Amino acid sequence: MDLGLSGKVAVITGASRGLGFATAQALAGEGCTVVMAARGLEALNKAADKLRSRWGRGSKVVPVACDVSTPDGVDHLMETAIVECGGIDVLVNNVGLGRGGSLEQTSDADWREAFDNTLFPAIRCSQLAVPHMRHRGGGVIVVVSSIYGREAGGRMTYNVVKAAEISLTKSLAQQLAKDQIRVVGVAPGSILFEGGSWWKRQQEDPKGIADFVGRELPFGRFGAPEEVGNVIAFLSSSRASWVSGTTVVVDGCQSKAF
């Protein structure tokens, strides 16, 4: 199926690995120019080279090393996207962090860190992308949240900021429909990739994670980043033109919520 994304400009945060890289890969495969944002320049350049080697040296891939938890980092990312690519059609907000423990164990600093690294990047990137999308007659904003934003399951700080992202998705979708800008959420379940949180836990406690898989994952395995990236590519396309304001769960039936 041709998704009609050829020539579109897509900005993806957290793009050097995992879900972000898989999303960049899926969008590049559909002919998008991809602007890949991440903090670490070395890992980011390696990820960009992987895309170029797969889709050809002529592929337009723009790596931008920046910290989107800061206003300056977001400014740098969006300015680079406009200067290098001329506009923005798709924005994929894909960063998140949550530390701390129980209510009494979680400090104000833990809460601030969760909001600064999850919710505020999505807000700030969207604020700067919307005028350019409006100028182009529309666009798509994808907010990557989590099933733990719909039901408690991870760290408390992570649950809260991911729930906030789901609410943000609905609010933005209602505001921006008049501008032909769709806003869609994606809530992945437990996804395994090298260097990711589940991979680290698997290295530390293989039996415990095997028990978790058998107990909590109906298909008997973790999801793969590509299984989420492909959904994001579809939602970013005109094939999903009537999908806005909802959060699509991609979890292999892991979550218990309707």
Give short role names for the model-derived ranges.
Residues S126, V161, T169:
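Active-site helix of classical SDR
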Residues P131, Q174-K178, S241:
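Alpha-helical segment proximal to the catalytic Tyr-Lys
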Residues S102-L103, D110-F115, V213:
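Substrate-binding pocket helix/loop in short-chain dehydrogenase/reductase
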Residues V92, A177, R182, V243-G245:
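Short, small/polar-rich loop/turn modules that mediate ligand/substrate recognition or access, typified
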Residues S146:
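Residue(s) in the substrate-gating loop at a strand-loop-helix junction
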Residues V9, S16-G18:
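Conserved glycine-rich cofactor-binding loop
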Residues A233, S244-F258:
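Short C-terminal tail/terminal secondary-structure segment
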